[in-house]
UniProtKB/Swiss-Prot annotation:
UniProtKB keywords: Ribonucleoprotein, Ribosomal protein, RNA-binding, rRNA-binding
Superkingdom of this protein's organism: Bacteria
Protein name: Large ribosomal subunit protein uL2
Gene name, Swiss-Prot/TrEMBL: rplB
Region ranges (Disordered): 222-273
Family: Belongs to the universal ribosomal protein uL2 family.
Pfam families: Ribosomal_L2 (PF00181), Ribosomal_L2_C (PF03947)
Function: One of the primary rRNA binding proteins. Required for association of the 30S and 50S subunits to form the 70S ribosome, for tRNA binding and peptide bond formation. It has been suggested to have peptidyltransferase activity; this is somewhat controversial. Makes several contacts with the 16S rRNA in the 70S ribosome.
Signal sequence coordinates: none
One Gene Ontology CC term in the entry: large ribosomal subunit
Bias kind Basic and acidic residues: ranges: 229-239
């Protein structure tokens, strides 16, 4: 995997920095693990915009990823690594000894042909998935469940990881990349190692059109709008007149919006600002 800065042969190429990935599969994805993915344009069933800045973009199939890793005790090997347009991480096609194939998030340093396994007795090795009560304190993991059997929810993007800080009773304490320290049930599963493709953050798209290919539409500043459209709109010259807020008036900087008090007891330390 290498970082390549394109030559300025045109205005659209001048600022492009891309990640070259010769290890990824060049052909089509495995058809048995694809699903139709329909575009919404950011609209709900009433036709109203519920998520701004979404629309257009290239057609994509959704890849069914195995976030549960519940095929215990059956050895498997990485058949190939693939690009996934639906996430920043790459994915790996896994072939199990019984002939079944599944997609998983591609861990760092894993390559085609490497063996992996899931289950309580799995060795502590990158790519293996097991309950966190069986993983030593201090280990770096990813694809962490928040409820046993629900499937991975934490540390799934490119380069993401979580460190196990302690184990006490029915819970383990995790340090997340955000700086938050929280408790999760020790029966929850995690995959050993980090998510691969950490170089994803170094790429530069180089032009607005590259975002349009991805289905991302332009973001207009509130100060450039009229008063009817945004709290920052209108006025003479460039003047907000108020503290920075969202289009709906919620303070945009430093304001706490977390409302799930039921799970506050599991957060040992809030994330770093």
């Amino acid at each position: 995997m290498a970082i390549v800065k394109c030559k300025p042969t045109s205005p659209g190429r001048r600022h492009v920095v891309k990640v070259v990935t010769p290890e990824l599969h060049k052909g089509k994805p495995f058809a048995g693990l694809l699903e139709e993915k329909r575009k919404t344009g950011g609209r709900n069933n009433n036709g109203r915009i519920t998520t701004r800045h979404i629309g257009g973009g290239h057609k994509q199939h959704y890849r069914l990823i195995d976030f549960k890793r519940n095929k215990d005790g059956i050895p498997a090997k990485i058949e190939r690594l693939e690009y996934d347009p639906n996430r920043s991480a790459n994915i790996a096609l896994v072939l199990y000894a019984d002939g079944e194939r599944r997609y998983i998030l591609a861990p760092k340093n894993l390559k085609a042909g490497d063996p992996i396994v899931s289950g309580v007795d799995a060795p502590i090795k990158a790519g293996n998935a097991l309950p966190m009560r069986n993983i030593p304190v201090g280990t770096t993991v990813h694809a962490v469940e928040m409820k046993p059997g629900k499937g991975a929810q934490i540390a799934r993007s490119a380069g993401a990881s979580v460190q196990i800080l302690a184990r006490e009773g029915a819970y383990v304490t995790l340090r997340l990349r955000s700086g938050e320290v929280r408790k999760v049930l020790a029966e929850c599963r995690a995959t050993v190692g980090e998510v691969g493709n950490a170089e994803h953050m170094l790429r530069q798209l180089g032009k607005a059109g590259a975002n349009r290919w991805r289905g991302i539409r332009p973001t207009v500043r509130g100060m450039a709008m009229n008063p009817v459209d945004h709290p920052h709109g209108g006025g003479e010259g460039r003047n907000k007149g108020i503290q920075p807020v969202s289009p709906w008036g919620t303070p945009a900087k430093g304001y706490r919006t977390r409302s799930n008090k039921r799970t506050d007891k599991y957060i040992v330390r809030r994330r770093n600002k």
